[in-house]
A protein has these predicted regions:
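Active-site-adjacent helix-turn-beta-strand microarchitecture at beta-sheet edges
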Residues: 1, 43-47, 170, 179-185, ...
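Extended active-site neighborhood of metal-dependent phosphoesterases/phosphodiesterases
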Residues: 1-103
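Short Pro/Gly-enriched beta-strand edge/turn motifs at strand-loop
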Residues: 27-37, 163, 185-191
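His/acidic metal-ligating clusters that form di-metal
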Residues: 54, 60-63, 71-184, 248-253, ...
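Active-site-proximal beta-strand elements of phosphoester/diester hydrolases
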Residues: 59-68, 188-195, 218-220
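Hydrophobic residues embedded in beta-strands of well-ordered beta-sheets
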Residues: 60, 214-215, 398
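Non-catalytic terminal accessory segments
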Residues: 134, 227-401
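Short, solvent-exposed aromatic-acidic interface loops
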Residues: 218-229
Length: 401
C-alpha cells in the first residue's frame, strides 16, 4: 500500500506526478491515507487504496482497489461505518461508483505502453466469471445466493477493463483455481484466480514474462508442508468437546489420520461438502432422492426416454451420488487439478452421463435437476487451462504446456 525506497516508481489515482519527475519523498506524501479519498456520493468520502508500483525495472504492478463502500442512507452521518454497505460483491459497483478509477487505469495502461513497461494487474476480486461460465446454470439449480454467485462480475466489468487496456489480472477471494478469458476484435483479457494455500487445492502461481506478448503461468501444488499435523492434538480436544454436545454436528475424526498436507486439504473439502455445502446449498428433496443412488442408477435414469442401446453399466456401480457431488466441488475448487483426485475411469463415465442427460428430454423434476447438474459438471471440468499454460496476447489464446 505504501512506497518503498527501492521502488523505481509508485503512484495512486490521486497523485498527478509523472514517472519522469518521480521522487520517493513525494510518493510518501501521496501515500498518506487522507490523500487517497474520493466522494462515493455527495458528502460521503471513502478511501480508494489503488496504486501502481515498479518494484523491478520495466515491470509495473497495478493494484486495483475493487472495494466500493456505498452509503445506505444519504441523510445519515457520513462518518458512521455502519451506514455503508459491504464491498464483498467486488467489481460490479466500481462501474457506477468509481469511474475515476477506470479513467486512471486507462491512463496507467497508456503510460505503460508508451514506456514499454509490462503491466500486471491484481486485486482481491475477479474480473471474469470464475465458474467456467456455468453461473447461469448454477443459479437455476441452486438459486442466486449460492456458490458466491453475488460475487460473479457482470460481463460489463471485463469489457470496461479490457477496453481500458488491462490484459492480465490476478485475483483471490474465492480460494479457487481457475482461468477465465474474454476476447473481442480488439482486446483480450485473462483473469487468473489464485488458489488458497489453506484450502483445496493448496497451491500458488508462478508468472514468467517471456516477451511483450507471451506469459507463462505455472501452478505449484503444496503436496507436503512440514509440521502440517502439529496442531492435531488440539483438534482432537475440540472433537471430544463436540462429542459432548448433542446439538452440534461433529466432523470426521479420521481427518487427523491424514499423512500429507494435500491429503488434509482434500479431507477438509470432503467435510465442508458434507457438513456445510450439501445442507446449505442444495434443494433438500433433490439430495434425498439422490443420496441412495450409485453411478449405475444415474446411468439408467439418463437413458430414460432415449432410444439408445444401453452400454455396459457394471463399472458405474463403483461410485455413488455423494461421490458425484464431492467431485463437482473438487472441480469448482481446483479446476483441472481436481483430475488428480478422481479416478480416470469415472471421469470417462461422467462424459457419458453428460451426453445422456443433455439428450434427455424428460420433464420429470429430478431428471431436470440432474440434467442441470451434469451441465455444470461439464462446464467446470472443461474450462480454460489452469495448471501450466502459456498466454499469447497477440494470438489471443491460452494453451497448455
Amino acid at each position: 500500500f505504501y512506497p518503498q525506497k527501492d521502488d523505481l516508481f509508485w503512484s495512486t489515482p490521486f497523485n498527478k506526478n509523472l514517472i519522469s519527475s518521480y521522487s520517493f519523498d513525494d510518493a510518501l506524501v501521496a501515500a498518506d491515507y487522507t490523500k487517497r479519498m474520493y466522494e462515493v456520493e455527495k458528502g460521503f468520502s471513502v478511501p480508494d487504496l489503488s496504486y501502481v508500483v515498479e518494484p523491478i525495472k520495466d515491470v509495473w504492478l497495478l493494484a486495483i482497489d475493487g472495494n466500493t463502500y456505498i452509503p445506505k442512507n444519504l441523510k445519515e452521518n457520513s462518518s458512521n461505518p455502519s451506514n455503508y454497505k459491504g464491498a464483498s460483491i467486488g467489481y460490479n459497483n466500481v462501474l457506477t461508483n468509481k469511474k475515476h478509477l477506470i479513467e486512471w487505469v486507462k491512463n496507467i495502461t497508456a503510460e505503460a505502453k508508451k514506456r514499454s513497461k509490462t503491466l500486471i494487474a491484481f486485486t482481491h476480486y475477479p474480473m471474469i466469471d470464475f465458474n467456467d461460465d456455468a453461473s447461469s446454470e448454477i443459479e437455476k439449480l441452486l438459486g442466486d445466493k449460492k456458490w458466491q454467485l453475488e460475487r460473479v462480475p457482470q460481463e460489463e466489468v471485463a469489457k470496461v477493463f479490457s477496453e481500458a487496456g488491462i490484459k492480465i489480472h490476478f485475483a483471490g477471494h474465492m480460494h479457487i483455481n481457475d482461468t477465465g478469458s474474454r476476447k473481442t476484435e480488439n482486446d483480450f483479457l485473462v483473469n487468473i484466480q489464485v488458489p488458497s494455500l489453506a484450502a483445496y487445492i493448496p497451491a500458488y502461481k508462478i508468472l514468467t514474462i517471456k516477451s511483450a506478448d507471451k506469459m507463462e503461468i505455472e501452478t505449484q501444488i503444496l503436496d507436503d508442508v512440514p509440521r502440517f499435523d502439529e496442531l492435531f492434538p488440539l483438534y482432537e480436544k475440540e472433537f471430544l468437546a463436540l462429542q459432548k454436545d448433542s446439538n452440534k454436528l461433529s466432523w470426521n475424526k479420521d481427518i487427523l489420520k491424514t499423512k500429507s498436507y494435500r491429503e488434509l486439504m482434500l479431507f477438509h473439502l470432503k467435510e465442508l461438502v458434507r457438513l456445510r455445502m450439501i445442507p446449505n446449498d442444495w434443494p433438500k428433496d433433490f439430495i434425498e432422492k439422490g443420496q441412495n443412488l450409485n453411478g449405475e442408477d444415474l446411468l439408467l435414469l439418463g437413458y430414460k426416454g432415449i432410444n439408445r442401446k444401453i452400454i455396459q453399466s457394471k463399472n458405474f456401480k463403483k461410485w455413488t451420488f455423494d461421490d458425484l457431488i464431492l467431485d463437482l466441488y473438487k472441480f469448482q475448487s481446483a479446476d483441472e487439478l481436481a483430475k488428480r483426485d478422481i479416478p480416470r475411469e469415472r471421469l470417462e463415465q461422467y462424459k457419458v452421463l453428460v451426453e445422456l442427460f443433455a439428450e434427455n428430454q424428460s420433464k420429470d423434476q429430478f431428471i431436470l435437476q440432474l440434467k442441470m447438474l451434469f451441465k455444470i459438471l461439464s462446464h467446470l471440468s472443461n474450462g480454460e487451462p489452469s495448471n501450466h499454460f502459456e498466454i499469447d496476447f497477440k494470438e489471443k489464446r491460452i494453451k497448455n504446456i
